[in-house]
C-alpha cells in the first residue's frame, strides 16, 4: 500500500505523524520550514473553549468514546466564529482557509481524544504540553496521572506514532 507514491512501510520507518499528515493533505512531504510552520501553527491553535468541557461532562462516563468524540468534534464549529467561505466559488482564499481548518483540527482533536479518555477513567482534563513533539504530547495528555511526574515511554510513543 502506498500514500501519495510512498510505501507505508517507508513512511512508518522514516516519517512522523505530522509529516505523513502533511503528505496526505498537500501531496508532498514537508520541507523543514513547512513542518516547523505547521508545528508552530498547531501550537498556536491548541486551546479549546472551556464551554466544550460542559458538553463533555454532560455525557455519562459509560457512553461510547467515539460517540462523544464525534459530538465534541461537531460542536467545535460553534466555537469557530471566523468568516466562512464557499469552497464552490473560487475566490483565492480557499487554500489559506482550508489550511487554517486543518491546523485547528490537528491542534484540537488530540486534546478532545485525551479528554474523552481521561473523563471515562475519572481523571482530570489537561491541555498537554505542545513544547513536546505532537505524538509525545498526545501520549502525555492521555496517560499522565495527577500529581505524578510523567515519564515518557518511547515504546508507546513509537507505537502511537505508527498507529496515527
For the regions a protein language model found, what residue spans apply to each?
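Hydrophobic alpha-helical bundle cores within soluble ligand-binding/oligomerization subdomains
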Residues: 1-164
Amino acid at each position: 500500500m502506498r500514500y501519495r507514491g510512498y510505501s507505508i512501510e517507508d513512511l512508518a520507518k522514516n516519517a512522523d505523524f505530522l509529516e505523513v499528515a502533511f503528505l496526505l493533505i498537500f501531496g508532498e512531504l514537508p520541507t523543514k520550514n513547512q513542518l516547523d510552520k505547521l508545528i508552530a501553527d498547531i501550537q498556536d491553535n491548541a486551546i479549546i473553549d472551556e464551554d466544550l468541557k460542559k458538553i463533555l461532562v454532560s455525557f455519562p462516563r459509560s457512553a461510547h468514546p467515539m460517540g462523544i468524540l464525534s459530538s465534541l468534534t461537531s460542536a467545535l464549529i460553534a466555537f469557530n466564529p471566523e468568516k466562512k467561505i464557499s469552497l464552490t466559488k473560487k475566490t483565492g482564499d480557499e487554500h489559506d482557509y482550508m489550511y487554517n481548518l486543518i491546523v485547528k483540527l490537528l491542534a484540537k482533536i488530540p486534546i478532545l481524544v485525551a479528554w474523552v479518555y481521561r473523563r471515562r477513567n475519572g481523571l482530570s482534563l489537561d491541555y498537554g504540553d505542545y513544547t513536546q513533539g505532537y505524538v509525545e504530547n498526545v501520549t502525555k495528555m492521555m496517560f499522565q496521572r495527577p500529581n505524578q511526574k510523567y515519564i515518557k515511554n518511547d515504546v508507546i510513543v513509537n507505537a502511537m506514532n505508527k498507529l496515527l
